[in-house]
Amino acid sequence: MMNTINTKVLDFTISIIDTLYRGRHFQRFWVLEEIARAPYFAFLSVLHLRESMGLRGPEHIYLMEEHFAQTLNETEHLEYMESRGGNAYWVDRFFARHLVLIYYWVNVVYYWLSPRSAYHLSYEIELHAEDTYAKYLKYEDCDDKDIERIMIDEKHHAQELKEAMEMIK
């Protein structure tokens, strides 16, 4: 049931972002990368809280290391999008930062209550990001090696999230 809700919420959010950023690729990518870091920060926050409460599981250290690495990688993507003018407009920064604020706290609660479902949502988002970059490369700029590298990173993140879902059965 939660996976169905994840899919519907994701589809709705994607349709809004697609409409707002039609034809503005790097602004859209910047918003997506700004948002992409939020779940990993949320996961780390909850893992730290669980550790402080004595609720550490055997997978705890591995997950913390993976999520920290993912935040750094997503930050590199964000910086690339900034270098391409993705954050040039105040309205885009305003929209993304407010969306991140909401998304972060939703992920904190979601991860605390249902880590597998939280991972599933992030997994679906990473797959969407990979697909978004693949379409850009196919239809807009097939020679952008940085976008190609970012697309591969998104695929790797999706695989890591899938492994995390399996790990915490």
Give the location of each predicted region.
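Non-heme di-metal
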Residues: M1-K169
